[in-house]
Design a protein with these regions (language model features):
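Short, glycine-/Ser/Thr-/acidic-enriched flexible segments
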Residues: 20-22, 28, 110-112, 279, ...
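Conserved small/polar residues in nucleotide/adenosyl-binding loops
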Residues: 310-319
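A helix-coil-helix interface module used to build multimeric assemblies
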Residues: 2-226, 236-250, 316
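Long, charged, glycine-rich C-terminal linkers/tails
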Residues: 94, 304-306
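Acidic, glycine-rich loop-and-beta core segments that form the ion-binding/anion-interacting portion
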Residues: 230-304
Length: 319
């Protein structure tokens, strides 16, 4: 059993780490300290962390903060992390220390280990002194939250919502000539066209997209550069501006430095606002689904105004 582990040392002492792992003692301590949910960070979040470390190393190389060989090795290793080459090395539970220090160090250790491999015998890369140079968990983790969420909104959520909107709008046109009873509190009311009801559903989704775009703009403000407490202590005055410009270039999204680092790090109001927009969209989904279910109820004792295709056997078809 001893052959499957290696012993590493950090400020708290010795720690046994799986022999083949590219993470180090701080990650292993977090594995043992926080075995809470079994849920790990998403690919999007790991991608964002890799992008931050790569962009930071590029800036530190330009500013002369790191040895060129070490900086280039970090750039290559962090690029591999961003591309998904080492996702299995990100072993931590999403529930951990409030600042996300464990995941920041997981990233630093994986990048440092891989960068040292790339250097072969030409040097050694330290997770704190080199990979995390000019950064803190308190600004990198909030930055990764914004980057990963903003990219997911752009690449996944909005296209899916647009597809749903287009399908509902198409049905609104198709059903425009279908006359039915309107209802208030389920009681018959003045006539409406089925297409009009579906146009309302399509508009709900369109407005949901508009709301998401508004909150997405807030997520483009990044906390990077505030370091530990928002003051920017121990980092170069040009570090955040240059690094965020690189992140914006790599993603094609207009990321910028937060105008107030104390707000950006002391609160997550932009993320809460985004969650609110998602909650509104989910509520729209529930409303639409409930209406369609009600319209399709029956066929003998419900409304049965529309026919829904079976997606699974009905209980009455069994036995």
């Amino acid at each position: 059993m001893a052959d499957t582990y290696r012993t590493e040392r950090d400020s708290l002492g010795e720690m046994k780490v799986p022999a083949e792992a590219r993470y180090g003692p701080q990650t292993q301590r977090a594995v043992e300290n926080f075995p809470i949910s079994g849920q790990r960070f998403s690919r999007r979040f790991i991608q964002a962390m890799g992008l931050i470390k790569k962009s930071a190393a590029e800036t530190n190389l330009e500013l002369g903060n790191l040895d060129p060989g070490i900086a280039k090795a970090i750039i290559a290793a962090a690029g591999e992390v961003a591309d998904g080459a080492w996702d299995e090395e990100f072993v931590l539970d999403i529930y951990q220390t409030g600042s996300g220090t464990s995941t920041n160090m997981n990233t630093n250790e994986v990048v440092a280990h891989r960068a040292t491999e790339l250097l072969e015998d030409a040097g050694s890369v330290h997770p704190n002194d080199h990979v995390n140079f000019g950064q803190s968990s308190n600004d990198t983790i909030p930055t990764a939250i914004h980057i990963s969420t903003r990219i997911a909104i752009e690449e996944e959520l909005i296209p899916a919502l647009q597809h749903m909107h287009d399908a509902l709008a198409e049905k609104a046109t198709e059903f425009d000539g279908v006359l039915k009873s309107g209802r208030t509190h389920l009681m018959d009311a003045t006539p409406v066209r089925l297409g009009q009801e579906f146009s309302g559903y399509a508009t709900q989704i369109r407005k949901g997209i508009e709301r998401v775009r508004l909150v997405a703009a807030e997520l483009e403000e990044l906390a990077l550069g505030g370091t530990a407490t928002g003051t920017g202590i121990n980092t170069h005055e040009d570090f955040s501006r240059h690094t965020i410009a690189k992140i914006a270039l790599a993603t094609g999204i207009s990321f910028c430095e937060a105008d107030d680092h104390f707000e950006a790090q002391g609160a997550k109001d932009a993320a809460v606002n985004a969650a609110g927009a998602l909650n509104t969209i989910a509520t729209s989904f529930m409303k639409i689904a409930d209406d369609i279910r009600w319209l399709g109820s029956g066929p003998t004792s419900g409304l049965h105004e529309i026919c829904l295709l079976y997606t699974s056997p009905s209980p009455r078809d069994r036995g």
